[in-house]
Amino acid sequence: MPDIAIIGGGAAGFFAAVNAKITYPQTTVTIFEKSNRVLAKVLISGGGRCNLTNSFAQVKDLKHVYPRGDKLIKRLFKVFDHHDTYRWFEEQGVPLVTQDDERIFPKSQRATSIADCLIRKALQSGVKIRTGYTLERLTPLPDSRIKATFRSGTTAVFNKVIIATGGSPRAEKLSYLADLGHTIVAPVPSLFTFEVREPLFRALMGTVTDPVTLSIPTTKHRSTGALLITHWGISGPATLKLSSYAARYINEQHYCFNVAVNWLNETNAETVRERLLTLAATHPKKQLNSIRPDNLSARVWQYLLQKASLDSGKPWAELGRKGLHKLVETLTNDIYLITGKGVFRDEFVTCGGVGLDCIHLQTLESKVCPNLFFAGEVLDIDAVTGGFNLQAAWTTGFVAGSTYHSATPADK
């Protein structure tokens, strides 16, 4: 009886295992997890609620949510996409809900609903689950099977192996794959918050401005969304998206770089100037601090007036050309020095991993080691926050799990 090993007991690993067993019921499928707990990352996703996918209703181009791997994801979505994910979990008895921001959660609002579903389905299907197994080496055999050697000294031979170990902060952890001839793209963090040390700015802790545009001067990296100011610096969708889009650049800068905030999400400074002139003409006797652009809170507006060296008690009619210029510059190109990175809700996402040039794109099988497949974040695929990383796990897990025969070269 053919044996299939799944290395990694996370979302991609479980989905690969379940679908391998469903597609090939006569096989023996075993999940090997290095820790003593499976699906740990699923349990903390979405703040413990598990943002398992997204409706993609607001996604015009996959590259906007998958900075790396968008073309592969687009190809694989023809096999298993977010609609299939929604249907699959509801068919397993897990009702789902779509929020106004298009993120999808279990109706229970509990990540355990997703984890319990996967474990239950795996056990019902006959998948074996083994914890405390750390893979050290893979050895291709002459008969096309693969021998796995674990840290404990245990060895086993499999007809098919699926690597679903997730993202790794260090390339050395993937050295056993490099030894087989795979290209390993150096992993770097790709979802994190930014540290800003300016005390007056951090005094705005708890305020949200939506939308803003963030950009990194002298680069093409930019993002749009809500900006949350924290005791540490900045967070929120705009920050997290920029951290993903510019992950490698930011790493090369050792997490010390400038960010420009466009508080009005308007790229044309002249348009902002006209908006302010309209406010001045409409409310000439009103104080600057009493009339503000719609998306700015009173606290943020007061701070920006102060940063522009303007007297907040001055009437709009007395703003003047110099004051107008300072205010436009502050609103559209407000520069902050970022001095470090934080984490996002204890979630750790990396860009990097097994290079996509090493795999058959239709099946996720290795080009250098037949019957070795990959699923999830171990591949050089990553996404912005919003359920997109887990969707990549379900999609790649399904494809890797339900494919058995060796791939053909038709991957162009």
Model-derived features with residue positions:
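A conserved FAD-binding loop/helix module that cradles the flavin
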Residues: 164-180, 380-409
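Redox-cofactor binding/interface segments in oxidoreductases and associated redox assembly factors
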Residues: 7, 44, 163-167, 374
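Predominantly flavin-linked oxidoreductase catalytic cores and closely associated redox partners
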Residues: 112-113, 117-297
